[in-house]
Structures are given as C-alpha cells and as structure tokens.
C-alpha cells in the first residue's frame, strides 16, 4: 500500500557509534577521507540513486565500521601526536589548521612511518570520480512517474470559434 511506511527494526539500526568531537574529526579528516574513500562514495551513491536512506543501511554500516577501524589504528599507532594535533585545533579559536602546522607535521610523519599513509594533496579528495559498485541499479533511478495516457482523438469536425479568438487584444 502506498500509505504504509515500513521502518527498519531497531536491530537493523544498531551500530557502534563513532564517539569523537568535531576537533578530532577535523584533525583526522584528510587521512580518513583517503582511507575510507570507497565506502563513503558507495554510501553517497546509494543515497543519491535510491532517494531513500532505509535502502542504504548496509552501506552506512560499512562507513561506520571503516571509521571505527580508522580511529582504532590511529589510537594504536599514533595516539600521542594525534592528541597533540587535535588538542591544538580544539584550542585555536576557530579550529584553524594554520595555527597547528607543527603538530600536523608530527602527526603526518607518524602516520607515514607507522601506517604508510600519505596525506592527500589539497583537492585530491574533492575530485569527481566514478564509483565501481556491485549494487544493482535501482528499478527507477530517476524516480520518474509513469507517463500519462495520450489525449484521445477528437471525433467530428471542429468549427472555428463563433466570435473569433479568445485573446481579445489580437482581435482589435
């Protein structure tokens, strides 16, 4: 029925949350974007194609899982330089990167040495890319409505209007 909305169960929605502050997210954003690029783009493609977040729960869980694993690796290998970096960002008035370049360099060096991750260049993560996915195409990717039936043929002779055109300013 079109009026009934099926909601996912609480078990479908249950995932471990990424409990970090905005400063931590901002400090980790460049490396997170590079490491979790594929699950994030798969999720955004699903959201764009399906136009219904309920159909993208599995992709959302993969994004969450990738973020959790990313922060676990940072905590395991580079906790101290990362803490210094995000604390500096947190205490700089507007969460600006430019005031924390020294801590950023230490964090980037640690991540490169211990995890082999290179900080992406400016603009690398915002480039338009094609996403290869295993998901099937949605049935109606453009969410277009069914075409209406064409107008029926007019039967009989059509006579011109008795008083001319209805557009009075053309008939003056």
From Swiss-Prot:
Membrane topology of this protein: Peripheral membrane protein
Residue numbers covered by motif Cx9C motif 4: 100-110
Domain of life per record: Eukaryota
Region (Disordered): 133-159
Biased composition range(s): Basic and acidic residues: 146-159
GO CC, alphabetical: mitochondrial inner membrane; mitochondrial intermembrane space; mitochondrion; respiratory chain complex I
Subcellular localization, as worded in the UniProt entry: Mitochondrion inner membrane; Mitochondrion intermembrane space; Mitochondrion
Motif Cx9C motif 3, chain ranges: 78-88
Keyword set, alphabetical order: Disulfide bond, Electron transport, Membrane, Mitochondrion, Mitochondrion inner membrane, Repeat, Respiratory chain, Transport
Main location: mitochondrion
Motif Cx9C motif 2 in this chain: 56-66
GO aspect biological process, one term: mitochondrial electron transport, NADH to ubiquinone
Record PROSITE patterns: CHCH (PS51808)
Signal sequence bounds: none
Motif Cx9C motif 1 in this chain: 36-46
Domain CHCH: 33-74, 75-118
Entries under InterPro entries matching the protein: CHCH, NDUFA8
Cysteine disulfide links: 36-66, 46-56, 78-110, 88-100
Domain notes: Contains four C-X9-C motifs that are predicted to form a helix-coil-helix structure, permitting the formation of intramolecular disulfide bonds.
Described function: Accessory subunit of the mitochondrial membrane respiratory chain NADH dehydrogenase (Complex I), that is believed not to be involved in catalysis. Complex I functions in the transfer of electrons from NADH to the respiratory chain. The immediate electron acceptor for the enzyme is believed to be ubiquinone.
Family: Belongs to the complex I NDUFA8 subunit family.
Record's subunit section: Complex I is composed of 45 different subunits.
Protein name: NADH dehydrogenase [ubiquinone] 1 alpha subcomplex subunit 8
Organism (species): Bos taurus (Bovine)
């Amino acid at each position: 029925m079109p009026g009934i909305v099926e909601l996912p169960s609480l078990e479908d929605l249950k995932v471990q949350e990424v409990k970090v502050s905005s400063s931590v997210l901002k400090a980790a954003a460049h490396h997170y974007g590079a490491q979790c690029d594929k699950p994030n783009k798969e999720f955004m493609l699903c959201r764009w194609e399906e136009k219904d977040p309920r159909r993208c729960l599995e992709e959302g869980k993969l994004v969450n899982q990738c973020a959790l694993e990313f922060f676990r690796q940072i905590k395991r290998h580079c906790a101290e330089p990362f803490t210094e970096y995000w604390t500096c960002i947190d205490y700089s008035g507007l969460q600006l990167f430019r005031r924390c370049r020294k801590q950023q360099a230490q964090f980037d060096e640690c991540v490169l040495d211990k995890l082999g991750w290179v900080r992406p260049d400016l603009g690398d993560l915002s480039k338009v890319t094609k996403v290869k996915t295993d998901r099937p195409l949605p049935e109606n990717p453009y969410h277009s409505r069914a075409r209406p039936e064409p107008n029926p043929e007019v039967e009989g002779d059509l006579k011109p209007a008795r008083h001319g055109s209805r557009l009075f300013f053309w008939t003056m």
